[in-house]
Amino acid sequence: MRLIALSLACLLPLASLPATAADASVEARLTARGLKFSIDDDGDYKVVLNFSEEGRTQLVYVSGGTEDVSGLSIREVFAPAANIKTDGVTAAMALDLLRESRTKKIGAWEIAGDYLYYVIKLPDNVDAAQLNAAIRVAGSIADDKEIELSGDSDRL
């Protein structure tokens, strides 16, 4: 019984840590481009793009962690475009999104949980200007799709 209590006591502080830790290199690159951001509970960097001409905003996230793919460190930039359930994304639309992804030079549509995201996967060694460009591309494409699917709604 003491062993169980001791084990739980040792693990308890870990429960409050985010799933992925934020990365100081991302913070430095965002700051270098003058982008304001916050860090969410998962350790991802949340940027709100302002499309002033359209009077709209768009959420874009930069993952706080990376994934290793054959020795290449990959970081994701992702922007939500729709809620699958409330915005009525159908199976036929999903096939259209796959076809549309084929036409994009960088990034593709993905579904995670109940949301449709535009996701760009980059080598983590991109500089501040390149990361900023990816953020703007993902945000613009996602916002255009949000308008297409939900009309004037600007929830994401």
Tell what function each PLM region has.
Residues 23, 27-30, 91-95, 128, ...:
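Extracytoplasmic/secreted envelope proteins and their assembly/folding machinery
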Residues 73-115:
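Short, internal acidic amphipathic alpha-helical interface segments
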Residues 13-18:
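N-terminal signal peptide c-region/cleavage motif recognized by signal peptidases
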Residues 20-70:
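N-terminal secretory signal peptides
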Residues 41-43, 51, 64-66, 78-81, ...:
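A mature extracytoplasmic/lumenal domain signature
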